[in-house]
Amino acid sequence: MAHKKAGGSSRNGRDSDGRRLGVKKFGGQAVVSGNIIVRQRGTKWHPGTNVGMGKDHTLFALVEGRVEFRTKANDRTYVSVVPALEAAE
């Protein structure tokens, strides 16, 4: 009777799926209130004007307008939303 001994079993072969983090709305893009701008772990980007931060550090728009990224003197990058009224002027 033909027979093949059982091969060893590998302990590798697992990997978790990516978490889909990163910038979702880029500088100059239009957003409405509640739109997610950045998903992140920790504060790589900080909330600026008209931007809120969720408990998982997600940044989201508080008003309708355009997204703006700005680096300040303390080397922190802030994400702001310039309201649609100001952007039109």
From Swiss-Prot:
Disulfide bonds: none annotated. Gene3D superfamilies: 2.40.50.100. Keywords: Ribonucleoprotein, Ribosomal protein. Residues 1-24 are annotated as: Disordered. One of its GO terms (cellular component) is cytosolic large ribosomal subunit. InterPro entries: Ribosomal_bL27, Ribosomal_bL27_CS. One of its GO terms (biological process) is translation. GO terms for molecular function: structural constituent of ribosome. HAMAP family: Ribosomal_bL27. Belongs to the bacterial ribosomal protein bL27 family. This is Large ribosomal subunit protein bL27.
